[in-house]
Each structure stands twice: as structure tokens, then as C-alpha cells.
């Protein structure tokens, strides 16, 4: 992760040591989750749970998602069941799936025990899709509208259900069989007359992908069309999820990391290249360097044994 302001990080450490938790909380709520997660990377292990418990519930979950796998696992081991449930309850389903895929079996069991029945069902559905497919990175938390709704009815539905959705700007219109027939935006709905029907507002020429589409292809579509979200459908064009821009960016980072590691002869890493420590890169590259060294030594020995012959040529 990028380093946050060093002075701010040191200030947070001092406030932790001095147990000035109220002041610390006031500072943390002004920071972005990504930057707070970066602070955790510079903390001693015993300080991490203390800082995490100071965070407001929603901010704590958002920060948790931005942490690296090792920090997440360390914190989970220190959580009580009720603390873990608070975090899990605040996670979007796709983030919960990402977390589960990176954790050991004993941690996964704890996470699933604390998830409610509906979330467990959604997690299990997403885990069925092949790795690196659109289905594996999509979320099932989005706004669905019906074509015969008025703009006023649609806005009311968004207000009523939007709080638990990963994105509400783009809304998806489906028929009675859940087949995707159009999309619209909150902006379009707000600018329409109250009694105007969704079917007269929506865009019918919808670009979508199937659940088995390669995630790299999906990420490329975000780049090509400047999407904020992309609908995912099954083989019968039924809407099953959406991929959001933040997940597409994660895919792009993963692919870039793989390309860099291949060029640098480095073993694959779970972390993006720019977030991996120098020691981590050394451990990944060392086996290849050892092989090259042995190969060079072997080649040199062969050449040396033929020096006399070569000298007479």
C-alpha cells in the first residue's frame, strides 16, 4: 500500500501509547479506509486490535476490506465471535467471498458461522463459479426495477432498499422471469416526471457478460466503455449479479502484477507488485536466481573442460 503521511502515522502511534482514544477516533473518522489500512501495516501486532476497536463499525468494515491477507487473519484470530459478526454483517457479499478465498479452513468456518443465513447462501452461490470468471467477482447486491413502475415508485424502492446495495447509481430492469431488459440511472429517474414509466426511461441496448466470461475480458470492457458497473447474466439472459468498478480495478492490478513477475522471473504473489516488500520480492525471485546460478556454473564447467580443444581451433 502507498505510505500515508509519516507524521500522521507517528501521531496515531503516540496517541495509542498515551491511550487518548477519543482524540484518536476523531482523527480516524476523517481518514479514508485505504489510508487507515496502511497505518496498520506500520503498527506492532499488539496495537492492531486496539486501533481496530476504536473505529466506528461501518468504517471498521471498510478498512478491513482494504487490509492485506496477513493483517486480516491476525485480527480475526483476536476477534470474539460478536466482534467478527459485526465485521461480517457490514461486508458486501463479494468482499466476504474474497476474504473466504484467502483464509485457511479454520478461519473460514468461523466467518461462515457468523454470517446470517441469507449471506451464507449468497456466498455459496458465488463460490460455485470458476476462479477468474465474471461470476466469481460479481456481487448480488444491486437495485432491480420493473418496467411498469413509475419513476416515483422506482425512487421510493431505491430509498427503501438502497442502503444495503453495493451501488445504486445504475439500476437494472428485469421482466417477470428476471430477464434483463434494460438499465437506467438514478439521474434519469430524478429528472423524469413522477408518473413516467421506467420502460420509457430505460436504455434497452444493454451490454452484459455471462457468468463464465473471463475476468480479464470483463476488466477490459470497463476500460472500453467507461462503465461503473456491468451486469452479469446466465445463459438465458437472467440477471444474476453485477461487477463493479472497484472489482474490475482489482483484476487489472492482479493481471499487471502477473505480467511484472513474469518479466522479472519472480514466483507468483498474492499481493500487487507495488504492495510487496523488498524481502517478499527477494523470496519470490531467489529460487529462479539459484537455478540460473547453478545453470551458469554447469555451463562454465563444460566450457572449461573444452578449453584446450577450443584453443587449438
Question: Where are the regions that the model predicts?
Answer:
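Hydrophobic packing positions in regular secondary-structure scaffolds
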Residues: 1-267
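Alpha-helical transmembrane segments and their membrane-interface boundaries
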Residues: 148, 258-313
